[in-house]
Swiss-Prot record:
Pfam families linked: zf-B_box, zf-RING_UBOX
Designated gene of the protein: Trim63
Its EC number(s): 2.3.2.27
Lineage of producing organism: Eukaryota, Metazoa, Chordata, Craniata, Vertebrata
Coiled-coil intervals, chain numbering: 207-269
Single GO BP term: regulation of gene expression
Protein name (record): E3 ubiquitin-protein ligase TRIM63
Induction: By hydrogen peroxide. Up-regulated in response to amino acid starvation.
ZnF B box-type: positions: 117-159
Assembly and interaction partners: Homodimer. Homooligomer and heterooligomer. Interacts with SUMO2, titin/TTN and GMEB1. Interacts with TRIM54 and probably with TRIM55. Interacts with TNNI3. Forms a ternary complex with RACK1 and PRKCE. Interacts with CKM.
Chain spans, region Disordered: 325-350
Annotated catalysed reactions: S-ubiquitinyl-[E2 ubiquitin-conjugating enzyme]-L-cysteine + [acceptor protein]-L-lysine = [E2 ubiquitin-conjugating enzyme]-L-cysteine + N(6)-ubiquitinyl-[acceptor protein]-L-lysine
Length: 350
């Protein structure tokens, strides 16, 4: 049984297989050796080395001084980052299976007859294949067009040489673009890290600011409680003094009321001898009672508590002026301190 013929299908399947054997860098069929990346995509080792060198311009290859550190590049198919050791792309594993499939595919293609129309033909000369490239008009054409046709006065070159040259140029452009994409990806990663660090720093300063304001709130609450306690203490002392006076005056009023009642009863006494026996003492008691009205009194403005008034406008202004410090303010403050120290030093020498 011919196993090779069973491996290579016919028709469109051949074209699909060929697409799977195309290198994403040079856009041609893989050139041996073929290396397999950790992401399971394949590259020609030469193409892999080109994009590796483009992404790591300071890495020296086998021909130069040996670098003890590896490098990295991204797979052109999936953008997976490939990390190399000090051997570079020569440390990548060869994909022998793909190389064998390429050999079988080429054998099968060479054994098949060339299908009609598989090679591009000239539109002016239908039996002539396009085999040269007009450098003047920058279009592929045939030999008859150069000898007899529209491109007699044009400069031409072999189609294959121009084909290989432009393919090489395009491959170089792809390598440069892939390397550029790697640099852009690095910048994106740096910017993402910058966003993360910015958020972390913002959270940290917010926490610090909240703690400082909480400290201010605690100081204000403590001072408020202290001042309210002093007002309450003063109130209690004054009220105690006033209530003591009220008690004294009530006792005096009670004594005076009883004395008045006794005196009125004495006035109703019809007998002179009886009246006179108590009148002198009653008169003396009334005089003393009238003097008792001279008990202590509160001074004018005793009830006033205005001396506990606070002027907090300057503190309120200072609170409103709270703001974040700037580097310029810190520099000015440092310069002022330096000037003051210099002045003190000068005076000391004098």
């Amino acid at each position: 049984m011919d196993y090779k013929s069973g491996l290579i299908p016919d028709g469109n399947a051949m074209e699909n297989l060929e697409k799977q054997l195309i290198c994403p860098i040079c856009l041609e069929m893989f050139t041996k050796p073929v290396v397999i990346l950790p992401c399971q995509h394949n590259l020609c080792r030469k193409c892999a080395n080109d994009i590796f060198q483009a992404a790591n311009p300071y890495w020296t290859n086998r021909g130069g001084s040996v670098s003890m550190s590896g490098g990295r590049f991204r797979c052109p198919s999936c953008r997976h980052e490939v990390i190399m050791d000090r051997h570079g792309v020569y440390g990548l594993q060869r994909n022998l299976l793909v190389e064998n499939i390429i050999d079988i595919y080429k054998q099968e293609c060479s054994s098949r007859p060339l299908q009609k129309g598989s090679h591009p033909m000239c539109k002016e000369h239908e039996d002539e294949k396009i085999n040269i490239y007009c450098l003047t008009c920058e279009v592929p054409t045939c030999s008859l067009c150069k000898v007899f046709g529209a491109h007699q006065a044009c400069e031409v070159a072999p189609l294959q040489s121009i084909f290989q040259g432009q393919k090489t140029e395009l491959s170089n452009c792809i390598s440069m673009l892939v390397a550029g994409n790697d640099r852009v990806q690095t910048i994106i990663s740096q910017l993402v890290d910058s966003c993360r660090v910015t958020k972390e720093n913002s959270h940290q300063v917010k926490e610090e600011l909240s703690q400082k304001f909480d400290t201010l709130y605690a100081i204000l609450d403590e001072k408020k409680s202290e001042l309210l306690q002093r007002i309450t203490q003063e109130q209690e002392e004054k009220l105690g003094f006033i209530e003591a006076l009220i008690l004294q005056y009530r006792e005096q009023l009670e004594k005076s009321t009883k004395l008045v009642e006794t005196a009125i009863q004495s006035l109703d006494e019809p007998g002179g001898a009886t009246f006179l026996s108590s009148a002198k003492q009653l008169i003396k008691s009334n005089v003393e009672a009238s003097k008792g009205c001279q008990l202590g009194k509160t001074e004018q403005g005793f009830e006033n508590m205005d001396y506990f008034t606070l002027d907090l406008e300057h503190i309120a202004e200072a609170l409103r002026a709270i703001d974040f410090g700037t580097d310029e303010e810190e520099e000015e403050f440092t310069e002022e301190e330096a000037d003051e120290e210099e002045g003190v030093t000068t005076e000391g020498h004098q």
